[in-house]
């Protein structure tokens, strides 16, 4: 424990917070162009084929971004909007694409949790 003299002489230094979304340069989203589309298998207790896109951002950085939802219409050279947010069972994938913006179509079959997948509200006939 520090004495009161030591506390007055040396102020405590703040811990630096590590930025995990460096490629976005502090922005909420960035535009990018798909270079490659691939599937990755998740970490151990899980088993699936997760869709991942290799994206070159407008900042010239190349990242891997997860494509959420079932099915997608992306192809190489499609323009996407990328946000931060890691996929827990895919190591090294720290970004997600935003559905329903630019060239990435929304998940049309969704009825619940539509805002995360860019789906419009279905028309109700009365």
UniProtKB/Swiss-Prot annotation:
Entry keyword Translocase: no
Main localization category: mitochondrion
Molecular function (Gene Ontology), one example: structural constituent of ribosome
Keyword Mitochondrion applies: yes
NCBIfam families (alphabetical): rpsL_bact
Family: Belongs to the universal ribosomal protein uS12 family.
Name under which the protein is recorded: Small ribosomal subunit protein uS12m
Higher taxonomy: Eukaryota, Sar, Rhizaria, Cercozoa, Chlorarachniophyceae
């Amino acid at each position: 424990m520090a004495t009161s003299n030591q506390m007055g002489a040396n102020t405590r230094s703040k811990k630096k917070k590590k930025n995990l979304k460096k490629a976005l340069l502090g922005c909420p989203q960035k535009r990018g162009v798909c270079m490659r589309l691939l599937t990755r298998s998740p970490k151990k207790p899980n088993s699936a084929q997760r869709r991942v896109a290799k994206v070159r951002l407008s900042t010239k950085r190349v990242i891997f971004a997860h494509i959420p939802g079932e099915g997608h219409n992306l192809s190489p050279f499609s323009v996407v909007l990328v946000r931060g947010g890691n996929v827990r069972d895919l190591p090294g994938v720290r970004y997600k694409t935003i559905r329903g913006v630019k060239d990435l179509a929304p998940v049309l079959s969704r009825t619940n949790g539509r805002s995360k997948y860019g789906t419009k509200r279905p028309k109700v006939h009365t």
